[in-house]
Swiss-Prot record:
This is CRISPR type I-A cluster 1/Apern-associated protein Csa5-1. Oligomerizes as an infinite helical thread in crystal structure; disrupting a potential salt bridge between Asp-35 and Arg-55 leads to altered elution from a sizing column. By immunoprecipitation Csa5 interacts weakly with a Cas5/Cas7 complex. There are 3 csa5, 3 cas5 and 2 cas7 genes in this organism; the immunoprecipitation studies may not distinguish between them. It comes from Saccharolobus solfataricus (strain ATCC 35092 / DSM 1617 / JCM 11322 / P2). Gene3D superfamilies: 2.30.30.1260. The keyword Plastid does not apply. The keyword Ribosomal protein does not apply. The gene is csa5. The lineage of its organism: Archaea, Thermoproteota, Thermoprotei, Sulfolobales, Sulfolobaceae. Keywords: Antiviral defense. CRISPR (clustered regularly interspaced short palindromic repeat) is an adaptive immune system that provides protection against mobile genetic elements (viruses, transposable elements and conjugative plasmids). CRISPR clusters contain spacers, sequences complementary to antecedent mobile elements, and target invading nucleic acids. CRISPR clusters are transcribed and processed into CRISPR RNA (crRNA). GO terms for biological process: defense response to virus.
Length: 162
């Protein structure tokens, strides 16, 4: 396990946008993009899977709608912010514990029983959609060519929550 700790640290710091994008699919329970990262031994297959996940993610972003979400960073003083919602889900469509486990991906929509599912960075009253850029993707693919563990650790961090 010690050997993978530096990989996990590197991925958390350098590739956090990829983690957040994949976490979006975890919340949707779309593991077709997660499982190959864990089980594949072929970097090309992993790159193909990630490329497809990115294409679909771009499709989600292009059809997102803006909603007023509630941010509970300080439970005593919740804040509302406008945010792009990639998916709007009803309460019964989300497992009960997911909003607390994936609290930076699932947000309660203000004055509604629905949830906004989007990987966001929230600063004060501003919410920004997280999207991996081309240089991050290229760098990850380069790392993947030299160490297949990058894919497995990326998947583990995406499933892990927050």
């Amino acid at each position: 396990m010690e050997a993978s700790e530096p990989v996990a640290e590197t991925i958390s710091k350098r590739f956090w946008t990829l983690i957040k994008m994949l976490r979006f699919y975890v919340v949707l329970r779309r593991f077709g993009y997660i499982d190959p990262l864990i089980y594949s031994i072929d970097p090309k297959q992993i790159k193909d899977v990630l490329s497809e996940a990115l294409r679909e993610f771009v499709s989600y972003t292009s059809s997102s709608s803006s909603r007023s979400i509630v941010i509970y960073d300080d439970p005593k003083n919740p804040v509302t912010a406008q945010a792009p919602c990639l998916v709007v889900a009803k309460r019964d469509e989300i497992p009960q514990n997911f909003p607390s486990i994936y609290r930076y991906t699932i947000y309660k929509i203000d004055k509604s029983s629905e949830y906004c599912i989007s990987p966001l960075v929230v600063n004060d009253k501003y919410a920004t959609l997280i999207t991996p850029n081309e240089s991050v993707i290229k760098e990850f693919f380069d790392k993947l060519d030299s160490n297949i563990q990058y894919a497995r650790v990326l998947a583990s961090l995406a499933v892990g929550g927050e």
